[in-house]
UniProtKB/Swiss-Prot annotation:
Lineage: Bacteria, Pseudomonadati, Pseudomonadota, Gammaproteobacteria, Lysobacterales
Chain positions of site May be catalytically important: C155
HAMAP family, per database record: GTP_cyclohydrol_B (MF_01527_B)
UniProt-listed InterPro entries: GTP_cyclohydrolase_FolE2, GTP_cyclohydrolase_FolE2/MptA
Pathway: Cofactor biosynthesis; 7,8-dihydroneopterin triphosphate biosynthesis; 7,8-dihydroneopterin triphosphate from GTP: step 1/1
Enzymatic reactions: GTP + H2O = 7,8-dihydroneopterin 3'-triphosphate + formate + H(+)
EC number: 3.5.4.16
Gene Ontology process terms (BP): tetrahydrofolate biosynthetic process
Family, similarity comment: Belongs to the GTP cyclohydrolase IV family.
Gene transcribed to yield this protein: folE2
Superkingdom as given in the UniProt entry: Bacteria
Function: Converts GTP to 7,8-dihydroneopterin triphosphate.
GO molecular function term, any single one: GTP cyclohydrolase I activity
Name this protein carries in UniProt: GTP cyclohydrolase FolE2
The keyword Hydrolase is annotated on this UniProt entry: yes
């Protein structure tokens, strides 16, 4: 009985000889260690690991090699500095395939404790979907960090229409009244202020920023803080009525079309980041479709 185990990827030739741009695995379950100024965090994520296959006569790559390298790296914090070593090891592990490029994508949710708007003793958890891509090619490494921020948007046109209807209703009801006390007006508004309300919706901003090879952390807190400060209406976690009231005030003070939100982010991010892309989606409550805008191609 033969004790040798066949290795088809090594000993067989492909039926069609052709180079492949990327080959690897997707959907790999991995632990992710994050280091931020807020402290460390361990989360579960998924990864995609790939290399190029320029050798036309090689039938297949050695995916187990990539898996073991990714598994070994998983015990380290996820940083650009550390990822550079992983990418280099991936390329070196496939010298027999003439590989010169490698890339890894990580997908996970970053959890953060956020305080209520007004209640000092109240806070709750928020989850931010994160995507990190690292690609090595031609001796250079590129990093893109993407985070999705959820916020509320209220339609400026709808707000104007609601104000007009409220004003018309007030005038119609008081057409024969020449003078009203402030208290009377306030009482009327408390009873009739919702005569017409503007439509609003949960909205999503996907923000991608370039990172440098020398970065010692991803900078997630700074990026999220910057985006939420620009938008002014991030969705909340735990709230009381006083916090919900403050949120309503923020929405009224920050009426936004999808174009407004995208331009706000474009202007504000340019102060802090040299290279970035913004994709915004408003999950319309008036229409069955979404409104979208972006600063770059998808």
């Amino acid at each position: 009985m033969s004790t040798s185990i066949p290795d088809v990827a090594v000993h067989d030739s492909p039926a069609i000889a052709a180079p492949l741009r990327w080959v690897g695995m997707d959907g790999i379950v991995v632990p992710v260690q994050l280091t931020t100024a807020d402290g460390g965090q361990h989360v579960i994520g998924r990864a995609r690991a790939q290399i190029d296959l320029p050798a036309m006569g090689v039938k297949g790559i050695h995916m187990s090699r990539l898996y073991r390298l990714l598994d070994t790296y998983a015990v380290e914090p996820l940083t650009p500095v550390g990822i550079c070593g992983l990418l280099s090891a991936m390329v070196n592990s496939h010298a027999d395939c003439a590989s010169t490029a490698a890339r890894v994508d990580w997908y996970f949710d970053w959890l953060r404790r956020v305080p209520a708007l007004v209640s000092n003793d109240l806070s709750g958890w928020r989850g931010y979907p994160v995507w990190l891509r690292a690609e090595y090619s031609a001796g250079h490494v590129q990093f893109w960090l993407c985070v999705e921020v959820a916020y509320s948007s209220t339609c400026p046109c709808s707000a104007a229409l609601a104000r007009q209807m409220l004003a018309d209703a007030f005038l119609q009801e008081h057409v024969e009244v020449s003078a009203l006390s402030p208290e009377t007006v306030a009482d009327w508004l408390r009873s009739n202020g919702s005569y017409a309300t503007p439509h609003s919706q949960r909205s999503l901003a996907r923000i991608e920023v370039a990172l440098t090879e020398q970065a010692v952390e991803l900078g997630l807190p700074a990026l999220v803080d910057c985006a939420e400060r620009i938008l002014s209406t991030p969705v909340q976690a735990a709230v009381r009525r006083v916090d919900e009231q403050a949120f309503a005030r923020l929405n009224g003070a920050n009426l936004m079309y999808v174009e407004d939100a995208t331009r706000r982010l474009q202007h504000g991010l340019a102060i802090h980041y040299s290279a970035f892309r913004v994709h915004v989606r408003h999950l319309e409550s008036l229409h069955p479709n979404d409104a979208v805008a972006s600063t770059a191609d998808e």
